[in-house]
Amino acid sequence: MTIEFNATKREGQGSSASRRLRRAAQVPGIIYGAGKDAQPITLDHNELYHLLKKEAFHASVLSINVEGAKETVVLRDTQWHAYKQQVLHIDFQRVDASQKLHLKVPLHFVNGDNAPAVKLGGNIIAHVMTELDVQCLPSSLPEFIEVDLAALEAGQSIHVSQLKLPAGVEAVHHGEGDPVVASAQTTRGAAAAEGEGEAA
């Protein structure tokens, strides 16, 4: 389901205009890309704040209604106030249905409590990555990628190459190797008990 929300065209630009908007509970933003001119926009702070709390808002194709004109976009950047729960500025990139997107998608870890590493090995599972860089067409963009921990044994790890990615979705690697997504690690208590057992 596409997330839809409203925005208006922003006329005044610059820091003083942005401050006036924020005092009026509005957020300055911009829509750019797809070979078109950048469009400065204004959004309602309260609506945007609650949208940003949704995980799907960060990894979905979004639809912005700008005074009756629909823009299909993805979220690219959000600037927050240093200590207030206030959005200062937001950037959206237009989506071309025929062009692949490069975006971070959240990872959802399942069956961790049933993993042999936990049930039999007394391990804890460390989530080394919480999101994955992917590349795909907009129509193939998943809201999240599931990481099944059901078969994870004590001392083992799950790597990016072992993830079951949806059709048309590729993982984007930064650097060499096959990054670790999650690993089963011995707890201090279990390690101490094991050491005592060996000593006996």
From Swiss-Prot:
GO terms for molecular function: 5S rRNA binding; structural constituent of ribosome. SUPFAM superfamilies: Ribosomal protein L25-like (SSF50715). One of its GO terms (biological process) is translation. It holds the Pfam family Ribosomal_TL5_C. Gene3D superfamilies: Ribosomal protein L25, beta domain (2.170.120.20), Ribosomal Protein L25, Chain P (2.40.240.10). Residues 1-20, 179-200 are annotated as: Disordered. InterPro entries: Rbsml_bL25/Gln-tRNA_synth_N, Ribosomal_bL25/Gln-tRNA_synth, Ribosomal_bL25_b-dom, Ribosomal_bL25_C, Ribosomal_bL25_long, Ribosomal_bL25_short, Ribosomal_L25_dom, Ribosomal_uL5_bac-type. Keywords: Ribonucleoprotein, Ribosomal protein, RNA-binding, rRNA-binding. GO terms for cellular component: cytosolic large ribosomal subunit. Part of the 50S ribosomal subunit; part of the 5S rRNA/L5/L18/L25 subcomplex. Contacts the 5S rRNA. Binds to the 5S rRNA independently of L5 and L18. Belongs to the bacterial ribosomal protein bL25 family. CTC subfamily. This is one of the proteins that binds to the 5S RNA in the ribosome where it forms part of the central protuberance. This is Large ribosomal subunit protein bL25. It comes from Azoarcus sp. (strain BH72). The gene is rplY.
